[in-house]
């Protein structure tokens, strides 16, 4: 009898099996809710949201007109607000039409991969990674390419990244501050990465996109500066969510 699910779905299941076993059938799963146990497995907030956020959300969910069901497209006011925020906070200039609103960064990752990859394209990601990168890449028929961090610094292993690039490479996912290591990648590494991607794109006559997952970019301690990879490489896609910093 043939497999009841598609090969693509089977690959997604394989990519996530270990994680879901940990979340559902491990010591963590059995004891995670015990009093005094802190859950560091997933980047969820451990405190209730501030009252001001709750109030704003309660007001915003009131339908504005009779055609309230869902939001069918980007809203110009939201796009303009994001442009101004990025300019003042990051020093990165975008046009309003560059902004695409999604239901969180998970959806942004999914939409981006579906837009820039074709089946068989390779997508590099840094390991250890956020657990669902590989499954998302596989879900669009692309090939996940795992590159380990520098074991001493936990920073980018630039030589390994350069060696991992092939004529089929379409994108690289950079997550800074990194989940799970917490490392903020410094400007020198990001500039060197940009040079590698620029040279490889020219050599292969095919643009390699940098997907910058910046979900944790406002959760930084000890007044450390933050550097967006998008500042150094023009063929970048900045992915952001309000879900992580609005605790």
Regions found by a protein language model. Name each.
Residues 214:
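Walker B catalytic acidic pair
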Residues 13-104, 111:
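N-terminal small-domain helix-loop-helix segment of the aminotransferase-like
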Residues 11, 148, 181, 243-245:
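Glycine-rich "substrate-gating" loop/helix at the edge of Rossmann-like oxidoreductase active sites
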Residues 210-211:
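Residue-level marker for buried hydrophobic side chains located in beta-strands
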Residues 66-205, 218-233, 237:
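Conserved core of the PLP fold type I
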Residues 43-45, 176-179, 244:
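Short glycine-rich anion-binding loops that position phosphate/pyrophosphate groups of nucleotides
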Residues 236-247:
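Active-site PLP-lysine loop of aminotransferase-like
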Residues 1-19:
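Conserved PLP-binding active-site segment in aminotransferase class I/II-type PLP enzymes
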């Amino acid at each position: 009898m043939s497999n009841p699910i598609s090969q693509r779905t089977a690959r997604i299941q394989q990519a996530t099996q270990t994680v879901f076993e940990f979340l559902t059938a491990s010591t963590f799963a059995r004891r995670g809710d015990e009093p005094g146990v802190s859950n560091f497995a997933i980047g969820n907030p451990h405190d209730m949201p501030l009252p001001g956020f709750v109030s704003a959300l309660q007001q915003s969910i009131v339908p504005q007109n009779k055609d309230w069901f869902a939001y069918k497209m980007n809203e110009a006011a939201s796009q303009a607000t994001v442009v101004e925020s990025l300019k003042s906070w990051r020093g990165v200039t975008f046009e309003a039409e560059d902004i695409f609103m999604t239901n969180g960064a998970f959806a942004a990752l999914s939409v981006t991969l579906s837009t820039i990859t074709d089946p068989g394209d390779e997508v590099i990601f840094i390991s250890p990674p956020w657990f669902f990168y590989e499954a998302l890449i596989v879900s669009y028929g692309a090939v996940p390419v795992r590159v380990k961090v520098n074991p001493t610094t936990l920073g980018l292993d630039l030589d390994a990244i350069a060696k991992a690039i092939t004529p089929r490479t379409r994108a690289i996912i950079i997550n800074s501050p990194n989940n799970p290591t917490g490392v903020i990648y410094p400007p020198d590494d990001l500039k060197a990465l940009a040079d590698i991607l620029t040279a490889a794109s020219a050599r292969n006559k095919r643009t390699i996109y940098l997907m910058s997952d910046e979900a944790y970019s406002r959760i930084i301690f000890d007044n450390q500066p933050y550097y967006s990879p998008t500042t150094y490489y023009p063929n970048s896609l900045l992915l952001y969510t309000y879900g992580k910093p609005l605790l």
